[in-house]
Design a protein with these regions (language model features):
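Conserved structural motif at the start of ABC-family nucleotide-binding domains
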Residues: 2, 17-19
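The feature captures the beta-strand-to-loop junction immediately N-terminal to the Walker
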Residues: 33-35
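Conserved ABC transporter NBD signature motif
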Residues: 56-71
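Conserved ABC ATPase "signature" region
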Residues: 95, 106-122
Length: 182
C-alpha cells in the first residue's frame, strides 16, 4: 500500500497543499486529478522521495520514504520529462540507465522499443526525436525493468492514437499482476 498521512508541502512560502491523506491500493487504476498548477507532480515527487514533505509521512509497502529509505523502491517513474543525453541514441540512453541496476538486457529493451513502435528509430540520436518519440522513450525507461510500481505523470502526452492504445493495453495488463501499483 502507498499512503500519505498529514502531508503538507510549500514552496517559497506558498502552500501547495496541506494535510493530504490518501491511500493508493494495488491492482487498481489510481489517479491524481486537478487543475494545472495544483501540485499533482509535486505529490508524485513526494511519493518517489525526490522531494520531502514539510509535514506528514509517505509510506510505500510499510517503508517511510525519507526515513527507512530515501527513495521509492522497485518503481518505474516518468515525471516531468526526464532529460536524456541529446548526443546518444535512444538505445544508448536506455542502456546507460540499464547499467544502474543491471537487471535488463539490450534485447529486452529492444522488445519494449518494438512494442511501442520505436525500433526503427532507436539508433537515432535523441536530439532528433519528435515529442511523441521522446515520450515513448520516457515510458520505456519507466517500464523496462519490470517494476511493481509505476508512477507516471501525464503518460499519454504527445502519443499518437496507436501508441496510446498500446500504453492502455500495457497498463491494463500491468495492474492485473499481484501487488502492482499504478
Amino acid at each position: 500500500m502507498i499512503s500519505l498521512k498529514g502531508v503538507s508541502k510549500s514552496y517559497k512560502g506558498i502552500t501547495i497543499f496541506e494535510d493530504v491523506n490518501i491511500t493508493f491500493m494495488p491492482n487498481k487504476w489510481n489517479f491524481i486529478e486537478g487543475v494545472n498548477g495544483s501540485g499533482k507532480s509535486v505529490l508524485l515527487k513526494l511519493i518517489c522521495g525526490f522531494s520531502k514533505p514539510d509535514t506528514g509521512i509517505v509510506t510505500v509497502d510499510d517503508y517511510v520514504i525519507g526515513q527507512d529509505c530515501d527513495f521509492i523502491q522497485n518503481a518505474g517513474i516518468c515525471i516531468n520529462s526526464p532529460d536524456f543525453f541529446n548526443n546518444l541514441s535512444g538505445m544508448g540512453n536506455l542502456l546507460e540507465i540499464a547499467k544502474i541496476k543491471k537487471i535488463v538486457t539490450k534485447n529486452e529493451i529492444y522488445q519494449f522499443c518494438k512494442l511501442f513502435g520505436l525500433e526503427e528509430d532507436i539508433n537515432k540520436k535523441y536530439k532528433y526525436y519528435s515529442l511523441g518519440m521522446k515520450q515513448k522513450l520516457r515510458i520505456i525507461q519507466a517500464i523496462m525493468e519490470s517494476p511493481n510500481i509505476l508512477i507516471l505523470d501525464e503518460p499519454f502526452d504527445a502519443l499518437d492514437k496507436q501508441a496510446k492504445q498500446i500504453m492502455q493495453n500495457y497498463l491494463n495488463d500491468f495492474i492485473k499482476k499481484e501487488n502492482h501499483y499504478l
